[in-house]
Amino acid sequence: MTVTRFSVFVIALLLSLGYGSNASAKGKGYDPHIDPTNFQTKVDNPYLPLVPGTTYKYLEKEGRDTRENIVTVMPDTKVVMGITCTVVHDVVNEKGALKEDTFDWYAQDKEGNVWYFGEDTKEYKKNGVDTEGSWEAGVGPNQPGIIMPSHPTPGKPFRQEYGPGHAEDMGQVIALHETVTVPDGTFKDCVKTKEWSLLESGHENKWYAKDIGVVRTESTTKEVVTLISVTHQ
């Protein structure tokens, strides 16, 4: 049997991400090979396209509480680990007051995997501003992870981020071809994921629609997030 260069690359990538071992669960041995020449400037994965000028409006509900979540793909970029990342601005408002203000950094490799390289986040609380969730890949032990694989397939968990003690989110594709109805419409053939943090209890399920991205999120805390609208500049 002939093993192609592409096959060797894929095998190496999966092993570096912890597939087929317990490295992804414990963090030990997680050291993905990041080559800037293997990344492109656009993020055009069908299930997580990040087109500058696109704004997503979501409604968050948990019991009687509601919050507005506005996610905007910025024209700005940020270089992380030598890679030009797309900047996404994520704002959460509650009763007209700013609650969270975050800048996330994403990049896509040439195989189509969307990587998460960190965030600059501020959470506004009664006693001040909390920036504990901020982290950047390549700084100290922090490493990037994959948010959306190039070819989503139900299987083993993978790391979405790795900052020991403060950024340890995991992801797992659990279903394909899901149909989801939200205020923005009905979407077929959605990818369903399970996502959780190794630092906290509980998890959430997300549905990603083709050519859109996240359209619905359900958490074990009973929080439900639905897509209200998508606009393009």
Briefly describe each language-model feature range.
Residues 8-18:
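Bacterial N-terminal signal peptides
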Residues 17-26:
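Bacterial Sec-dependent signal peptides at the C-terminal "C-region" and cleavage site
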Residues 26-233:
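Conserved functional acidic sites
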Residues 1-9:
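Bacterial N-terminal signal peptides that target proteins for export
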